[in-house]
Amino acid sequence: MAVKVIIPTPLRAYAGRQASVELQAATVAEALSALTAKFGDLKKHLYSDDGRLRSFVNVYVNDEDIRYLQKDQTRLNEGDTVSIVPSIAGGARY
């Protein structure tokens, strides 16, 4: 089924500068796999060397955090939106 994947601004440089893409996927894992197949440079920013989603990368399906659903096996429905949200750390030291 067709789903929309939102690509965050910091990662758009690795995705042809696209803000979003439409992909065919039945689960979050399939959507992310299709995304990294389409944009190979994204893979190292989303996954660690052991193939796991990086801990600072949060994924949402229709604003629901997949960590509280079925993680990457969360089922997708036609028209769902998958959002990738990398955590940002840093700041000034006082």
Regions found by a protein language model. Give the residues of each.
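Ubiquitin-like/PB1-type beta-grasp interaction modules and other compact soluble beta-rich domains
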Residues: M1-Y94
